[in-house]
Amino acid sequence: MTRIVGIDLGTTNSLVAYMKDGQPCVVPDRNGRAMVPSVVALTDNGLIVGDSAKEHLTRNPERTVYSVKRFMGKGLTDVQSELAYFPYQLTETGGVIRIRLGEKTYSPPQISAMVLKELKRRAEAYLGESITKAVITVPAYFNDSQRQATKDAGLIAGLEVLRIINEPTAASLAYGLQKHTQGTIAVYDFGGGTFDISILKLKDGIFEVLATNGDTHLGGDDLDRLLVDLFIGQIQEQHGIDLSGYPDHMQIVRLEAERAKIRLSDDLKTKITIELPNDKGHFTRELTREQLESLAIPVIERTLAPCRMALKDAGLTPKDIDEVVLVGGSTRMPLVRHRVEALFGKAPHCHLNPDEVVALGAAVQADILGGGTTDMLLLDVTPLSLGIETMGGVMSSLIRRNTTIPASAKELFTTYVDGQTGVDIHILQGERELVKDNRSLARFRLKVPPLPAGVPRIEVTFLIDANGILNVTATDMRTGQSQSIEVKPSYGLSDTEVERMIEDSFKFAADDVNARKLIEARLDAEALLKTTNKSLTEAGHLIAAGEAEGIRNALSQLTTAKDAADPRTIRARMADLEQAAKHLNVVMLDDSLRKSLQGKKVTEVT
């Protein structure tokens, strides 16, 4: 049976998971790390993804892309207020956001596909088999455009996306599998760039989503920005430096803000140290948890309104909730947990790793689709109402939000003008009454014979599949003529573009693998050169002159090999250097131990 993996494609980090002996497990890298930073960087050697790309955030910020999930299925006008926070260049072509990296531009699905390819490669290396099918998670409040963009990313990465599943729902699957529980649960999902709340009923292996709500532009990134604005303002005030003109230092500030936020989940205070440009020294200050929380309160309070709305839509009160499950790294903040407990009147469930639980649940759903797990059934819902434009610029909803999917709905419409020869079907998504306040998904035209107004009968059918993606058919009931469309997002990619990207991914697959091997070898070589040079400088006097000269020769040979285009040669010279420096490393360790024990009594070290 072909293995199907579960993927959590996150704003900050992404993970891939699989089922082993009936339990979901995340796939680690060779260093045991499960999370792949959702970062892509363009280097002189090509595109890199993950941890190695993250290192370029401060080195080369204009050519390093992060938080691309915030742009999925969106146009430039949707994210106008955020542009100042991103050092890389964003443009728009045909309503699609494009991200410039060097001479080329990429759409958000293309960047996301690079992250998915890395997850695919990691899973294949770990499991020892080809991976071609996956379940990918999205925020529950992602609209049709964003879901289609995610599916496009999977296709470009060479994955057959069997199911798009909502992140809170995935988390509930992992939770239900572990706890074997019954009852009503609330899944509070506060990630890097999005927030979701879902209310589910668990009974006899059936996971029924009762209601969902959220904000696809609310997450840990927003907390980081509060600190960034604070630090930048204080640097301007104290040192007279406007960091907005220094993209590399802006990234240093952003990363320090993120690290400080994380530290303050465990500590009551932390020290902030930020290097200033042009050798102007450092900005330092102490930041307390209380100060962070005073800044964060408005952001965290914004998560509570969707919670109340979801409860209302489900016809429940906080007392009806049996368990609250926390998902997403941002839920590690003590203030978040305190506010969630205050809202629901019970301490949240914190035993599952909030960073991994979504990927684990996706693996469970993948196993269900593959026929491995047969005693669990998932009944998800559509997060937003779907409908069409009617006379006067009003939206008529056919499928209401929180309807269990897959779902279908039909409604009859007619013409309003005598002799009308066609009907324009304008498909919308949203909760507002007027067309202008909702999101336009697609338009198409149905031809009708010229008849008096009100005579034609046009049946419009909406069919939303288990991925939350919509198909619409309009039929003239008098003639039987119909017109159908699979709704493509206004800010999405055309079929031709996606097909071209998929063809390119296969066409250049071998070149991509070789380029990747070369990039990885060069990066590893640079790291080895740096550490060995440092060791030789600090401890060269502890070894014989001839041995030190041998290390220098090996360093020189690796430096030369690093610029070649053969990863095997680079790896061979790395092995030579590691062998040449083996005794130096032992001597350094002995010297370090000797210094640490110097002057101590036996009783102090036993």
Annotate each predicted stretch with a short phrase.
Residues 1-95, 101-114, 121-606:
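Oxyanion-binding/catalytic loops of NTP- or PPi-dependent enzymes
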